[in-house]
Amino acid sequence: MAVKSIKVKLRLDDMPEIRAGLWKLHKEVNAGVRYYTEWLSLLRQENLYRRSPNGDGEQECDKTAEECKAELLERLRARQVENGHRGPAGSDDELLQLARQLYELLVPQAIGAKGDAQQIARKFLSPLADKDAVGGLGIAKAGNKPRWVRMREAGEPGWEEEKEKAETRKSADRTADVLRALADFGLKPLMRVYTDSEMSSVEWKPLRKGQAVRTWDRDMFQQAIERMMSWESWNQRVGQEYAKLVEQKNRFEQKNFVGQEHLVHLVNQLQQDMKEASPGLESKEQTAHYVTGRALRGSDKVFEKWGKLAPDAPFDLYDAEIKNVQRRNTRRFGSHDLFAKLAEPEYQALWREDASFLTRYAVYNSILRKLNHAKMFATFTLPDATAHPIWTRFDKLGGNLHQYTFLFNEFGERRHAIRFHKLLKVENGVAREVDDVTVPISMSEQLDNLLPRDPNEPIALYFRDYGAEQHFTGEFGGAKIQCRRDQLAHMHRRRGARDVYLNVSVRVQSQSEARGERRPPYAAVFRLVGDNHRAFVHFDKLSDYLAEHPDDGKLGSEGLLSGLRVMSVDLGLRTSASISVFRVARKDELKPNSKGRVPFFFPIKGNDNLVAVHERSQLLKLPGETESKDLRAIREERQRTLRQLRTQLAYLRLLVRCGSEDVGRRERSWAKLIEQPVDAANHMTPDWREAFENELQKLKSLHGICSDKEWMDAVYESVRRVWRHMGKQVRDWRKDVRSGERPKIRGYAKDVVGGNSIEQIEYLERQYKFLKSWSFFGKVSGQVIRAEKGSRFAITLREHIDHAKEDRLKKLADRIIMEALGYVYALDERGKGKWVAKYPPCQLILLEELSEYQFNNDRPPSENNQLMQWSHRGVFQELINQAQVHDLLVGTMYAAFSSRFDARTGAPGIRCRRVPARCTQEHNPEPFPWWLNKFVVEHTLDACPLRADDLIPTGEGEIFVSPFSAEEGDFHQIHADLNAAQNLQQRLWSDFDISQIRLRCDWGEVDGELVLIPRLTGKRTADSYSNKVFYTNTGVTYYERERGKKRRKVFAQEKLSEEEAELLVEADEAREKSVVLMRDPSGIINRGNWTRQKEFWSMVNQRIEGYLVKQIRSRVPLQDSACENTGDI
């Protein structure tokens, strides 16, 4: 069954004694779970680690194993005395060994086994807390009969085998032995239950006859076991991941730095020098001074230019080459400070001896950085009612715990209530346990989807969903009482919780479950593998399935058993998602339309008579992603305001560095500051720019003629004055942002400025980052300002961002589900919207698998990073949760290079941006975007005959351009995200493998000839290339041939994680030990031959870029064009 969670607010304004009782119950439950967790942690007898109180993310030992053993022995000896034991007390080692055995029974995850916390809690709590309990000893006659007994009584065959299995399990179970040993040593009972201990201040109701422990204690004990089980599993995973990183580090060192120990020592010395020169780096993280790939961007060009200079050449010559490269690649350039250090004679060996060394060491540093952040042990945290709360649980009617009942319309229409069968009530300062408390709940639209099903069965209900024509059957599940976490920190100021909620779970049956089926029938056609649900098709089952379930075109969810359709989804940034729907059909159904065009389709592997026919493709837009002139103006204005403040802060930070004690750093910063035209970027407010320029003029008059102390004091005073000036701007900006209009979103068609778009979330993130940088800005070079422990800096904005992300994920997942079911959101004549069935439904939703995006030249890194951070993972999980009740399958497909090849032709291409209309106007006050200005300058388009919507190849953008044929000027254009969605379909139906377009090869010798040997990183690659090698005559194009009958085994690197494999690949590529080959399946680029990756994409770029440039140059130049404006943004 699918589980839905509905959070309702309890109306407690007129029930102060119940409000206080709920808060008291919350504290008691947390204290009780803490009590039992402490017992379990002592029985474990191993080190416990907590977060360091310094707030630096490090760990420290909270309690050593010896301290745990000492405290445990103290408790055990005290228990023997309290129990009046007069028999053998046992040695310390015997008691500790017995305690550990008990722990492994309670928490089997400690020894790598599995167990059910509910069953363990019910099995052990009574024997451990009641001296008369006989549970677990194998002699109790109460409880359910064994399964083999029930089978024998029912006359079912196989009961003898089941009995044998039960006896085998019983003989292997050490429970009885451990419990008897505890009794022999006078340790029964081992502990008092929490509700009977001196720690509890509640007047609990007396136990019923035959009741050994209260349900409150049973749930507390169960939650403590659940926490320890989860913690033990996590602790093992953390240790394994740490060991893997250590092994990865050692393997990388052995493979890359043997024989270069002197260079390793030198680069460590370089990093130490940079650390000492910039103490502020350590305020971010301990590895902030490490050499990174980002800091080395452009190093190949810089080192090439430097190689022509003498080692003892003046620094000015080296610095000039740095600036030349930086000027040509402003957005693809690394750290000027790092290059300046590398130009010093003592560090030149790092790039003169081996130009690839620093690149490889940057990869190595990425491993060290992960190792530095990794933990060897999981952090152990005890429950706390305010800091680390757990929630009080209730069971449905008829359950094993304290129960609740949902009362429909108890106080009128839509005015529901909750009846708690047991609760606490505080009167005159005394908390007492009471029975049957009815609490009204606030109205909620979510509750309107619940309808009572049977008055004789209070837990039975109907669940209404807009994605189904009929109601789903369901039942109430468990529930939790929850408080708002932001209010818990202030509970010491009040006696009770302010806002209290009940989180109710509802178990809903899908259509297939209602028919008595475990899965829908089409689930047999697809295979979903692993946690990522990688999708594969059982091609041999397609024909039989379609014969049993012919396509009759039913619309909406009623058509799920009609035909077979797949909807692929490409998540984007500009629009939330792009979808493409394909239907499995017979090939003879493909009929040309009135224009003679055959429908777009993909062949299906192994099925000559079946094809996947394209039905529809479209963009899914959420509120905030629609475009209009007015909306764009508002969005650009608020971005421009924030961009001005960020630019001013960047200049202010550069001015601070001009006052550094390090002379070299100071002079480089000063040179950089005065060389940059302050007003050219047009990213500052005029008044602040004027104030800043005035301070620069004052400093220019002092530079070079005053002492270091006077210069640093002058810089500090200048910083302080412009910082104060900017402070007023920041305050005014914050005031405007807080008072800005926030339009309410209803439906999917409303135009709003922000809405649920990623652009809006990124804008909020940039606000937060700017405020953080501004609040912790140091006015003295090297000054480090950190947030105080427990700081709630910009907590409201942070919560707003988190809620915006959660809201986007849920809305996007809901929209994808409805689109897959064939529903569209339509407005009636009154403007009221509702979901209407318009298309036949899809049985499978296919997402791109982004976790394997390890290739540097695939999707733009910035775009992939934004999707990976939270959006894709969150949508995937939310889709799985929502799709289950609708019987929809959710899978993923290998997505590497799906945005770089045309789905129709297979040809590679480039993503392009359109020229903005404003850049073609006669009098354009705004500068060109940086990408357009770069294109114009590179191709010397002085006359700039640009038109609106001209395509500019940038590698980013929403238009994908690829060659359509080998003929010159024959190109295909399509929306890039729609193309990526269609590529996922092509890969699904063709059983795609990456080796069809990309191969990693190593240099080697075969029969005395230097050849490329394919790296067999998987079974598919091994099947195709285990006995093949590649040779070349040009060093660019490679041809394959067989190397003999002997087939090689799969490459050992298959055992590595894909991330580690790609790290090793990057290092090999830097040393030219391996080569990546690409090919064009369409045969257009280099006739479809295998080509070195760099040259392959160069051929693609030259072909498309040349065509687009030729188109622009073929026009009549526009006179006095505004295109001479070459500003940059």
UniProtKB/Swiss-Prot annotation:
Residues 4-9, 442-446, 742-746, 753-754, 792-796, 800-819, 835-839, 973-978 are annotated as: Binds sgRNA. The active site is at D570, E848, D977. Residues 785-900 are annotated as: RuvC-II domain. Optimal in vitro activity occurs in the presence of Mg(2+), but there is weak activity in its absence. A more complete study shows a preference for Mn(2+), although activity is seen with Mg(2+) and Ca(2+) also. The keyword Glycosyltransferase does not apply. The record marks N400 as: Binds DNA protospacer adjacent motif (PAM) on target DNA. Keywords: Antiviral defense, DNA-binding, Endonuclease, Hydrolase, Magnesium, Nuclease, RNA-binding. Optimum temperature is 50 degrees Celsius cuts between 37 and 60 degrees Celsius. CRISPR (clustered regularly interspaced short palindromic repeat), is an adaptive immune system that provides protection against mobile genetic elements (viruses, transposable elements and conjugative plasmids). CRISPR clusters contain sequences complementary to antecedent mobile elements and target invading nucleic acids. CRISPR clusters are transcribed and processed into CRISPR RNA (crRNA). In type II CRISPR systems correct processing of pre-crRNA requires a trans-encoded small RNA (tracrRNA), endogenous ribonuclease 3 (rnc) and this protein. This is CRISPR-associated endonuclease Cas12b. The gene is cas12b.
